[in-house]
């Protein structure tokens, strides 16, 4: 395994509590005396400077510095690796992030930056679960996408214990090594790959719902009842249920966020292999619209929308309306109903369901067409 050139670290608060908070201003050791004074004065650059005079393996330096020192010593990362610190949405998190970036810039790392994880805090457990862990997954996935999985490693030593579980799943999904150092360990350890694989076909089937929740944050559960029923237990792993003013909403779970971020990018790079062949231009046909009330009221807008789908997605041959509902708005998305690819159009109060005829001939190809349609939809929202 080649050493990582980009290291993504979760950040906790052990540097402050109990380490620096436990120092005494009258400590006879001059370094600890400086540290105590700088910490009490909240002079974070001075804290970084004082820490730099200590061995990085000393416990006073905190979990992040200790673990990175072990990573570098064992050759798991290059000496001047890019460093990204994912810290909590708290005052202490921001302050420790500032100390760490100042410390490692002094040490010669060309990139040492922080990423605040919105919602990652311990004052609101519900927000921690529904926002914080999801946002951690989102930030780490984007860093790995920016720098490439072959260049990255995750250091999951610092922070809340739940972050370790998220980090391990991220590493499994992204193909990135994950490291952890307990305070009683002499050295850092790597988590072995798990003997399971995430299912890209499950993501393609449910890509519409996952993309919707990623974009909107929370969506009323009633508007997605059919999709939840079709998804069964697999889909339940990807979503959290949240009550807002007495109404149930759906949001992506941390696992759902990881699966969606991972497979969306994988699909975009492998779509030519997964999708059926394009339809010839001569075989594409105009949309067929029924004569029902909702369709009649929105006929021209519907015609333009269905024509744009046929023109914009190479594998689509034509679209035709199936049924409409004047009372139940549904989110715009594409899904599989049996062997039929279906989409939904809505103006926010009325909905029309339409079928999409494509060049797909197998279940896997139909699932890939659903993913391509939802990707097209996200680009045109």
Regions found by a protein language model. Give the residues of each.
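Polyanion-engaging groove/track-forming segments
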Residues: 161
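Long, low-complexity, Lys/Arg-enriched
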Residues: 1-151, 165-381
